[in-house]
């Protein structure tokens, strides 16, 4: 499934936050903690049984993580799509297909 992540969703997210005056709480440290906490909450569904999990709950937590990532990029005054593309460019150099295809090794072990 293709992901159509664009400025419309980022704007909607910021408006939601700003309408509630929550931006005052969105420091890089608080947002970093929130991202970690929300991603940790998705792990609960996989504890003890990785095959039978509540997909709806996992998707809710994934959405929460993405929302906080949008807020973090706004707080740091960076373009989220641009930093994702920059990171992918770095990953392509660290993990060339011919060296890592089918491998779970870290780039330092390739």
What is each of the regions a protein language model found here?
Residues 1-62, 66-110:
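Flexible "arm" and connector segments at domain edges
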């Amino acid at each position: 499934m293709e992901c159509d992540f664009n400025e419309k969703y980022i704007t909607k997210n910021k408006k939601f936050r700003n309408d509630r005056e929550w931006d005052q709480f969105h420091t890089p440290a608080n947002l970093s903690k929130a991202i970690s906490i929300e991603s940790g909450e998705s792990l609960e569904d996989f504890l003890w049984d990785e095959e039978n999990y509540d997909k709806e709950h996992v998707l809710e937590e994934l959405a929460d993580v993405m929302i906080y990532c949008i807020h973090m990029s706004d707080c740091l005054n960076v373009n989220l799509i641009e930093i994702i593309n920059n990171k992918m460019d770095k990953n392509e150099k660290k993990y060339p297909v011919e060296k890592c295809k089918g491998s779970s090794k870290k780039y330092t072990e390739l």
